[in-house]
Regions:
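Arginine/glycine-rich "motif VI" loop of SF2 helicases in the C-terminal RecA-like domain
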Residues: 28-31, 84-93, 99, 105
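Conserved BB-loop
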Residues: 24-56, 72-78, 128
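Generic beta-sheet signal
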Residues: 68, 96-98, 118
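C-terminal interaction surface of TIR/SEFIR-family domains
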Residues: 1-8, 15-27, 35, 100-217, ...
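An anion/phosphate-binding loop that grips the pyrophosphate of nucleotide cofactors and donors
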Residues: 62
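Residue-level signal for short, function-critical loop segments
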Residues: 11-13, 70-71
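Conserved TIR/SEFIR loop-to-helix hotspot centered on a Trp-containing motif
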Residues: 71-89
């Protein structure tokens, strides 16, 4: 383990690129005097290393933890587990909020910590001032906070877009299970649908989101009465944008 002061950056896998941006900024701003642990960067966790042991060692040896908190990550157990592990060790933990979550929206127990918003320059000044304290420095390095925010914004805009798409897809599939093959197989571009009216109420909003984003085209053109009630008949077609841009990204997740 490095002899430098260590900053543990806690994040979920989908936010690894944001963790790397923050890691690089910390290292360059403090001229390499601070090291970072980012579990997805291929450097903090050597190939073949025991993952949990490496995490535990990094938590034990870290001087501060920055937890990347988004609407997605705060619902994952590891973010809370790692924050709790550092808190028990009396290691400072700073929740850094992004992608639609603000520090005022943090849930308990993360709300009990002093959080910061990634898109707020004053909050970033606080975070980097905390890092400077670790080194015993009286002043924080000169940092282009607006430039850092802009770097992060590129990731966040893409990330929130794909989360919106993913949520709409899963909502559609929950409303009508037969759509799973359409959205995930990559072998079907269009499918006829006959869906019970009460299910359509849940399906339509999800399809509208995807339609507005140019990812699906759908029409419902008639109804029929079956033994199970009223059904709506229609057709759902995936656009080339969905098949070429969205589907590969979903399969990587």
């Amino acid at each position: 383990m490095t002899s430098k002061k260590l900053v543990f950056i806690s994040h979920i896998n989908e936010e690894r690129e944001l963790a790397k941006i923050l890691s690089e900024e910390i290292k360059s701003s403090f001229l390499g005097l601070l090291d970072t642990f980012v579990s997805s960067d291929g450097e903090s966790l050597p190939a073949g290393g025991r993952w949990l042991d490496s995490i535990d060692a990094a938590l034990t040896n870290s001087a501060i933890q920055i937890s990347l908190c988004s609407p997605q990550s705060i619902n994952r157990p590891w973010i809370n587990f790692e924050a709790g592990a550092s808190w028990i060790r009396r290691i400072p933990v700073v929740p850094l909020c992004h992608s639609g979550l603000s520090k005022s929206g943090l849930p308990i127990p993360l709300a009990m910590l002093q959080g910061a918003d990634l898109d707020n320059a004053d909050d970033l000044k606080f975070v980097f001032a905390e890092l400077a304290k670790i080194l015993g420095a009286a002043k924080t390095p000169t940092i282009d906070y607006c430039g850092l925010i802009d770097k992060c914004k590129i990731f966040i805009e893409t990330y929130t877009y794909f989360n919106k798409v993913r949520e709409a897809i899963y909502a559609a599939c929950n409303a009508e299970q037969q759509l799973e093959k359409l959205f995930f197989s990559g072998t079907i571009q269009s499918i006829p649908v006959s869906i019970q009216d009460y299910r359509f109420v849940h399906l339509a909003p999800a399809l509208d989101v995807l339609k507005d984003l140019g990812l699906v085209i759908y029409t419902f053109h008639g109804t029929r009465i079956g033994s199970d009630g009223l059904f709506r008949n229609g057709n759902i077609t995936l656009t080339d944008k969905y098949l070429n841009v969205i589907l590969p990204r979903i399969k990587q997740a």
